Amino acid sequence: MSQQIHLSIDAMGGDQGPRLVIEASIAFLKRYPHTRLTLFGDFADLEAAVKGSVCASRMSLIQTEITVAADERAGSALRHKQGSSMWKAVELVATGQADACVSGGNTGALMAMGRKLIKTFPGVSRPAICKPIPTARGSSFILDLGANLNCSAQQLVQFALMGSALARVYGRENPSVALLNVGTELSKGSESILTAAALMREHPTINFAGFVEGHGLYQGEVDVVVCDGLIGNVALKVSEGVAAFIASSLKAKLRENRFNQIAGLIVEPLLRRWMAAYNPSNFNGAAMLGLQRTLVKSHGGTDKFGFEQALVAAVDQVSANIPERIAQCL
């Protein structure tokens, strides 16, 4: 990375507040010496967290007194929060002063501000949220994850094109694409899914592999999984909930009695490695595909390492010219 990359950060977004964002930012800057950050938020809080850091010279802090609430409607945020940390962070990218924006704040508001300030490519009605998920064969990309609750067949085809472009950046030469559906039979699915499948089969640049069911999502049989935002968001959050339940119930079982505690001492190192490999923080940082510049959504409840990974995702997307590649595919 020879050219310095400038990231714009909404430091007030997310559940943990600005201190976690600053700690993650400092760790990120140590890993990526050719980057600099501009953070928007409460100046006093940001300055206190940055004070004494060896990376302070590569961090610009800008005061904003307004924040976007987690439950605020997107329309309200557009009308009333134009001085917020989120708006200012997105605006810095829209005006070309920064290369990418990262926020862990309100997804709907962030998407609306991205569309308003950065704009989508011609023909793209709404961006799609896309991120990698761990699978038995490495990882797959899934989109949309909540930006578009109801999608036309044409939108699903657009998602397939954009997801394929992102997958190619990560080394998938001819990425396979599947539609998430209630069955693998050609006759099953809603009208929009069946129409999208027909269009994808005939499309010259989509390597369509048919349908994938929910239980096959983590088998890694395809590179890109396409669905509407309602299905995608529910599937992702159910998966996170099941994973958390399994981990907590297993820990409880291993503490249940003395025999289990002894067994736990034996298997604990293996379990730690397994949990670390599939930790959602490793895959944090969702791309908002279809915008003319790079905008990355961090999970609001992520930890320090997770937010750091969202910053890494932003750098990867800028370095690979993702928006330009998306435009070429549409």
From Swiss-Prot:
Coiled-coil annotated residue ranges, if any: none
SS bonds (residue pairs): none
Principal EC category: transferase
EC number: 2.3.1.274
Reactions performed catalytically: a fatty acyl-[ACP] + phosphate = an acyl phosphate + holo-[ACP]
GO cellular component, one term: cytoplasm
Keyword presence, Ligase: no
Annotated function: Catalyzes the reversible formation of acyl-phosphate (acyl-PO(4)) from acyl-[acyl-carrier-protein] (acyl-ACP). This enzyme utilizes acyl-ACP as fatty acyl donor, but not acyl-CoA.
Family: Belongs to the PlsX family.
Subunit structure: Homodimer. Probably interacts with PlsY.
Full protein name: Phosphate acyltransferase
Organism: Teredinibacter turnerae (strain ATCC 39867 / T7901)
